[in-house]
């Protein structure tokens, strides 16, 4: 872009044009070290040189340096010996955070490098006689420069915008007089335009940055200058040959220009350093005024020296003022920095204190809420504790009342027991020491029976064989059972009921008469090597048990029901007389229900499975005929030697089919079939499902059983006279009936002990007196079985007789 002025420029930092002269300004651009410059700038300069230079009195080239707001950081900045800055990739540091000396040195180096931009354009102006350099400070942001110049150019200027394909021109107003004008207003117009045009660079480059002169704080001129650091553009003025007057006028205006710029556009730089960097003859002093030397005309030597002295004095004075201002600025900056630090510190302390206060308030509020919750919980806990205390006190009172009642009940029971046991002379009261001594400290070898109630020990008390039953009194039910057994047995005296000899109530011990042959169950199932009972003994046992049950059922004032009648509770003495034992579960029936009425009662069942009355098990109602069901099962077991499970339907089917003999006990070979079948029918009637279908024990069962027993006794007496032992039952050596017959090598049977003693001394037969082939003995099982059967008959026949 090219601007041509026709008026005097009476201000600003550029050269002053004399009256009537043409002033040509060309804006150029280019890169540092570029030998050719920008293509557009070359076209503009070439066009201006070819078209305007012959007409112009002064020719100026302007280059705008970008605003320097930051410099490279020290760790990536290397200063070469050639004083060129080499910048690598990294962070940059704002100028206000760097020392002034570093900034000034960096500015000088950058300015020196930007002078190379004019080299290619100076070559194009070789034909010019003189050039003049001075510096302008411009900003390059904003609207385009050509448009701004076209918009604001006064009528006294001609503007040429040289583009690649066209030239845009704004001509002067033809009505304006081109003659030299001496009016101050007209001269100021051209000057104001160039000043505004120069200022437009500043405005367009940084429209939002404040002017350093607008700083309101003391000492902020240096900070604003550092923040908006800029350099004046290097400009070269190519002049035509001048007259002495023009040279003089130009020289005379230098102080005036210097004075104008001193108050407004002087950048905050160290001018002494700046003079050192600009050592060329044409450089302006302090980046504002340069020496003007006319190549055609030279002023007198004395006048030139005097002006130079005046300029130097003025520069010296300005330097002193600048140094003073810089010093004051530094002090103000230090004070400002200190004040800012204090403000920051106070602000930080205030913020911290505010945070602490807020935290304390929040903590206090939280603690209050927590305290309120804790208080509420505490009051709730206190109420719960008070309620628990009240409940505990009530429970404690109720417990004391219950303990008193229990103690009263215990004392009453104890009194009853003491009266019952202490005044009853029907049995003897033993001490625990006597029982322990008799049982040898309850030795396991003395145990003859064991059940759910406890253990039975064999002992001798008062030179009488006895059986001590030790009951476990670990539950109230067992204590009640023990007391009931004592109560019942102490009132009973019957030949077919076990006799109670004495008791030790404190330790739960009962002393019974001792029955040598054990229980009926051992004979039915042949346990403990018990021999099978003959049929007539079985008939008699059934009759004796019926008599004992009839005695219990007819007791006064209330009938007694055994409730646990079974073969294990029927004991046999040495003469095979049966007695009913274990009356512990016996019950005194106060309200006997009729047999033809089914009643349901809430009672605890007692007894053994398969022997419990089905109706009693179903309804809970106990009757005397409940024992009759167990009695019928015992009859069928004595006939068949089978388990009670399913025995009733099996015998019933056998009787109906006539196959009863197949179910009878095989250990007995001489069953009377007629009497046996009649006895089986009685057992089936007693084992009916309903009580109303069972016969009466005393009026219907006992008479039939008595008749059968009498028939059996008569038959046994007839057979007893013919019971003599055969001769082969006797041992040839001992002449006695043999117990363990053994066959020797001679074919004869001997008693084992006798033949072994004979063979130790002899090797011949005791009968034939001949030598024996060997000494081996063979057991004669057939003969031993026959001998045992004969002995049993003889023994039971003697019992019957």
Curated annotation (Swiss-Prot):
Residues 236-254 have a biased composition (Polar residues). Belongs to the protein kinase superfamily. Ser/Thr protein kinase family. Pathway: Protein modification; protein ubiquitination. It is an enzyme of class 2 (transferase). CDD domains: RING-Ubox_WDSUB1-like. It catalyses: L-seryl-[protein] + ATP = O-phospho-L-seryl-[protein] + ADP + H(+); L-threonyl-[protein] + ATP = O-phospho-L-threonyl-[protein] + ADP + H(+); S-ubiquitinyl-[E2 ubiquitin-conjugating enzyme]-L-cysteine + [acceptor protein]-L-lysine = [E2 ubiquitin-conjugating enzyme]-L-cysteine + N(6)-ubiquitinyl-[acceptor protein]-L-lysine. ATP binds at residues 448-456, 469. The gene is PUB34. This is U-box domain-containing protein 34.
């Amino acid at each position: 872009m090219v601007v041509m002025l026709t008026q005097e420029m009476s201000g600003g930092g550029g050269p002053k044009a004399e009256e009537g002269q043409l002033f040509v300004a060309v804006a150029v651009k280019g890169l540092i070290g570029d030998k050719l410059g920008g293509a557009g700038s070359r076209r503009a300069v070439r066009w201006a040189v070819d078209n305007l230079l012959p007409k112009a009195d002064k020719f100026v080239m302007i280059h705008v340096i970008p605003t320097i707001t930051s410099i490279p950081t020290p760790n990536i900045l290397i200063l070469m010996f050639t004083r060129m800055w080499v910048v690598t990739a990294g962070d940059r540091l704002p100028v206000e955070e760097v020392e002034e000396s570093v900034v000034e040195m960096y500015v000088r180096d950058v300015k020196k490098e930007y002078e190379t931009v004019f080299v290619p354009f100076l070559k194009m102006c070789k034909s010019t006689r003189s050039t003049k350099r001075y510096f302008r400070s411009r900003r390059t942001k904003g609207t385009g420069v050509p448009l701004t110049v076209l918009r604001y150019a006064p009528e006294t200027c001609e503007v040429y915008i040289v583009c690649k394909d066209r030239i845009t021109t704004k001509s002067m107003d033809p009505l304006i007089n081109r003659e030299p004008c001496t009016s101050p207003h007209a001269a100021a117009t051209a000057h104001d335009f160039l000043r505004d045009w120069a200022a437009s660079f500043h405005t367009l480059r940084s429209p939002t940055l404040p002017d350093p002169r607008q700083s309101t704080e003391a000492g902020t001129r240096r900070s604003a200058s550092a923040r908006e650091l800029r350099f004046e553009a290097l400009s070269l003025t190519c002049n035509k040959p001048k007259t002495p007057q023009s040279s003089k006028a130009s020289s005379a205006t230098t102080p005036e220009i210097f004075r104008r710029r001193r108050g407004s556009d002087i950048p905050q730089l160290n001018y002494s350093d700046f003079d050192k960097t600009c050592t060329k003859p044409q450089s302006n002093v302090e980046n504002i005024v340069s020496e003007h030397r006319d190549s055609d005309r030279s002023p007198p030597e004395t006048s030139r020296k005097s002006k130079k002295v005046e300029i130097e004095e003025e520069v010296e004075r300005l330097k002193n003022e600048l140094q003073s201002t810089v010093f004051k600025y530094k002090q103000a900056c230090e004070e400002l920095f200190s004040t800012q630090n204090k403000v920051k510190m106070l602000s930080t302390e205030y913020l911290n204190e505010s945070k602490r206060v807020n935290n304390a308030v929040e903590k206090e509020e939280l603690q209050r809420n927590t305290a309120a919750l804790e208080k509420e919980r505490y009051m709730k806990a206190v109420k719960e504790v008070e309620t628990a205390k009240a409940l505990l006190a009530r429970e404690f009172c109720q417990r004391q009342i219950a303990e008193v009642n229990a103690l009263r009940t215990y004392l009453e029971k104890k009194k009853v027991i003491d009266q019952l046991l202490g005044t009853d002379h029907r049995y003897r009261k033993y001490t625990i020491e006597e029982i322990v001594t008799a049982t040898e400290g309850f030795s396991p070898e003395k145990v003859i029976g064991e059940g759910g109630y406890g253990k039975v020990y064999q002992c001798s008390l008062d030179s009488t064989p006895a059986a001590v039953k030790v009951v476990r009194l670990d539950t109230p039910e067992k204590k009640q059972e023990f007391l009931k057994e004592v109560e019942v047995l102490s009132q009973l005296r019957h030949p077919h009921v076990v006799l109670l000899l004495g008791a030790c109530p404190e330790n739960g011990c009962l002393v019974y008469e001792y029955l040598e042959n054990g229980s009926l169950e051992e004979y039915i199932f042949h346990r403990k090597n018990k021999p099978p009972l003959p049929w007539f003994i079985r008939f008699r046992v059934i009759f004796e048990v019926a008599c004992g049950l009839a005695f219990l059922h007819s007791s006064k004032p209330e009938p007694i029901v055994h409730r646990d009648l079974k073969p294990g509770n029927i004991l046999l003495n040495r003469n095979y007389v049966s007695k009913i034992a274990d009356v512990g579960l016996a019950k005194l029936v106060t309200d006997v229900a009729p047999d033809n009425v089914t009643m349901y009662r809430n009672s605890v069942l007692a007894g053994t499975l398969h022997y419990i009355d089905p109706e009693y098990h179903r309804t809970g109602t106990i009757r005397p005929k409940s024992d009759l069901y167990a009695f019928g099962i015992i009859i069928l077991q004595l006939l068949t030697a089978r388990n009670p499970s399913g025995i009733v339907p099996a015998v019933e089917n056998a009787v109906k089919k006539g196959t009863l003999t197949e179910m009878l006990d095989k250990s007995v070979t001489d069953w009377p079939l007629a009497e046996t079948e009649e006895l089986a029918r009685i057992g089936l009637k007693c084992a009916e499902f309903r009580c109303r279908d069972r016969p009466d024990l005393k009026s219907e069962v006992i008479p039939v059983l008595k008749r059968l027993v009498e028939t059996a006794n008569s038959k046994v007496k007839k057979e007893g006279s013919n019971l003599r032992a055969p001769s082969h039952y006797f041992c040839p050596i001992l002449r006695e009936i043999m117990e363990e017959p053994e066959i020797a090598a001679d074919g004869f049977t001997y008693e084992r002990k006798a033949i072994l003693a004979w063979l130790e001394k002899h090797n011949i037969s005791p009968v034939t007196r001949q030598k024996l082939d060997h000494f081996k003995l063979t057991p004669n099982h057939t003969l031993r079985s026959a001998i045992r059967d004969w002995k049993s008959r003889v023994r039971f026949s003697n019992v019957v007789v």
